[in-house]
Design a protein with these regions (language model features):
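Two-component/phosphorelay signaling modules centered on CheY-like receiver
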Residues: 12-30
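The feature encodes the CheY-like receiver
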Residues: 57, 85, 103
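Conserved acidic carboxylate
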Residues: 9
Length: 142
């Protein structure tokens, strides 16, 4: 799996523009327009990273993040939202967000943050695989 993004944003115009920008920058983006649709996409497909708005109909981004982390605690999440109150930012991080970006934002900065998080995730994945190999060797040698 490489560079697959689940983008959940209820503003369809903004979502389409951001999807196009990320696609131009070599990401495969699935756009969902509410939290329920986002959860459905997440359970039916594999993604490397998720980007969620917070204020959405049917299921807000915080609830969606809780559901995603219950399914796969290692999936990186970025909140991209107009909600810039300290309490909201803290809640985002408490739910396991890797980053919390407030609108308006710099698209180039978002791109670099996505890449940095994906690189970190790949390193952690490699470490887990290496530990698995080591444990297999250890158990096989007994």
């Amino acid at each position: 799996m490489s560079n697959r993004i689940l983008l959940v944003e209820d503003d369809q115009s903004f979502g389409a523009v951001l999807k196009d920008y990320l696609t131009i920058n070599n990401f495969e983006v699935t756009l969902a327009t509410d939290g329920e649709q986002g959860l459905k996409e997440f359970t039916e497909n594999e993604f490397d990273i998720c980007i969620f708005d917070v204020m959405m109909p049917k299921k807000d981004g915080f609830s969606l993040a809780e559901d995603v982390k219950r399914i796969d605690k290692n999936t990186p999440i970025i909140f991209l939202t107009a909600r810039n109150m300290r309490e909201d930012i803290l809640k985002g991080y408490q739910l396991g967000a890797d980053d919390y970006i407030t609108k308006p934002f710099d698209t180039e900065l978002l791109l670099y943050k996505i890449k940095a998080i994906l690189q970190r995730s790949a390193v952690l994945e490699d470490d887990e695989q290496e530990q698995f190999k080591i444990s297999n060797i250890f158990f096989d040698s007994m």
